Structures are given as structure tokens and as C-alpha cells.
Amino acid sequence: MTALDDVIDFIDSGANMLMIYEIEKTDAFMVEFASVIRKAAEEIRTGVAGLRTLNDPETIKGCCIEINRLENQGDDILSNALCSLFKTKDPVEIIKFKDIYEHFEIATDKCEDVADVFAAILIRHT
């Protein structure tokens, strides 16, 4: 499943950026992104388990709805993070943090792509 692999790739590359950019302390926005991504991953796990039998399409549908809500929350976090970041005077910090924030937001987009795959499977099998 390419969509699922993309989620993992963006989480991994975002974490690697923390090391590459030598970010010693995460900020509140990164913590929020981590929480949203973790919750979306839990919904993906629940959805994958439900797809094995397709006995409970409502649970899978609920996962899709929640993942979509979490992706929207990721968009909001990015907006707030960038607004706060651009008040910073250090251009190097702006570049580093903007890159990391955008990577984590893309991870939430990729979670939504997985939810879209779930929805397509449900449509075909119900």
C-alpha cells in the first residue's frame, strides 16, 4: 500500500530533519503535530484491522472521518506555527522550523490519503 508507506516515509524524514538541523528541543507545535500524527496512526491501525474482515464498515467509516478531522487539525497547526515562526528574527531558524512543520503537515495529508483508500475499498465492497 503506497499511501501507508508515504505516511511512514514522511514521519521518518521529519524525525530525521530534527537531527539534521540539530534541533535540540522541540516546540509546542511539534508536540501538537506528534499527537495528531499518533492519533491518525491509531485510526489507520483500526481501519486496517477492520478491512481484514469488512464485518464492520461503520468502524472503518468512522476512522476515515476522524483521520480527515485530524488532517484538518494538522492544517491549523501549520498555520499557527508559521504565524508564530515568522515573528522570529533569525532567518536560519525560520527555514529550519518551516521545513520541519511542513513535513509533519504532509504526514497528516498522507494519513488522509490512507483514509481515501479505505473509503474506496468500502465503496467497492459494500
How would you label these PLM feature ranges?
Residues M1-T126:
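Cytosolic, long alpha-helical scaffolding segments
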